[in-house]
């Protein structure tokens, strides 16, 4: 109801897993065009590394992770690439999240955006300097 333009295109559920802080959301999407698991995962991996939402979305494709690995994550969600299912226009994504600390971090990000306040992150990047000749 909050996003009427997504009516009939998105359903989802969230499962509380047996840890104090971590849950998983399962998104069932209907896309406009056919896609493959590799295309989706490549796109989501790149978004998690190089886009403006990289502080919000992370990507993992390791069979070694367990739910407690995500406790304390600042990300809004961590896409589980191994669980991605793509079948034509139908896509299922599994997204882990810390439903306490991660949620709190997202509230802070939303408030910063609403107030147009973006505090610096530390450590600040050092300006590049030219190396001395012969070094």
Regions found by a protein language model. Give the residues of each.
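C-terminal substrate-binding/catalytic lobe of Rossmann-fold NAD(P)-dependent oxidoreductases
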Residues: 1-91
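NAD(P)-dependent Rossmann-like dehydrogenase/reductase catalytic/cofactor-binding core
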Residues: 71-135
């Amino acid at each position: 109801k909050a996003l009427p333009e997504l009516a009939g295109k998105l359903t989802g559920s969230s499962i509380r897993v047996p840890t104090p802080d971590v849950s998983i959301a399962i998104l069932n999407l209907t896309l406009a065009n056919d896609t493959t698991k590799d295309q989706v995962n490549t796109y989501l991996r790149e978004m998690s590394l190089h886009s403006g939402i990289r502080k919000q979305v992370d990507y993992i494709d390791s069979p070694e992770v367990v739910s407690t690995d995500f406790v304390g994550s600042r990300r809004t969600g961590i896409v589980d690439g191994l669980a991605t299912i793509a079948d034509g226009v139908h896509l299922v994504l599994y997204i882990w999240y810390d439903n306490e600390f991660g949620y709190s971090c997202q509230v802070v990000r939303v408030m910063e955006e609403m107030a147009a306040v973006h505090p610096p992150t530390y450590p600040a990047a050092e300006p590049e300097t030219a190396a001395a000749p012969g070094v």
